[in-house]
């Protein structure tokens, strides 16, 4: 190279939360929803794809809908607010477009939708939205929405879960949930992503 330049990149993501069959489903879904909706979904490491065993899909969707219902939208300065606005009108419109795309793609609208939350007339608010039965190759499962939208994707076995988790252009973050920490770490090692949270653990920026 003729020269070197210093620069920093703000990377995007479509991070997968892989919930294995032996995981505490309620804990895993709650942890995934909380992560996904942090900063109203405007987080590069947001767990926006939740992969669940097919036989637990409906239960996981119900748990996610219940968790989302507790995310009260409103003024970020109010103590009761759990979900603030998006950064701009342009971003709000983009997220709403993706919600409509998800509906047209045939995903099941479990919670939320394209309408503004009730009582949030001022500000760029979008309802926290959960889609079920999302196809891994659909646009809402492949493209970064950067808003409060969670895609629940069913899988048949562990190998398929890993394949789906790795099946995007992104590789920023991810999560694995299992009753067996050692097995969770083994699965985490198969995810092609920069960092993986195991059973809700977080990284420590002070760690070497």
What are these regions (language model features)?
Residues 1-135, 159, 163-164, 198-206:
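ALDH superfamily catalytic-core signature
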Residues 21, 88, 151-156, 177:
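A structural signal for short, well-ordered beta-strand elements
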Residues 53, 148, 180:
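Short, conserved phosphate/pyrophosphate- and ester-handling motifs at nucleotide-, phospho-/glycolipid
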Residues 157-166, 181-189:
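Short amphipathic alpha-helices within nucleic acid-binding modules
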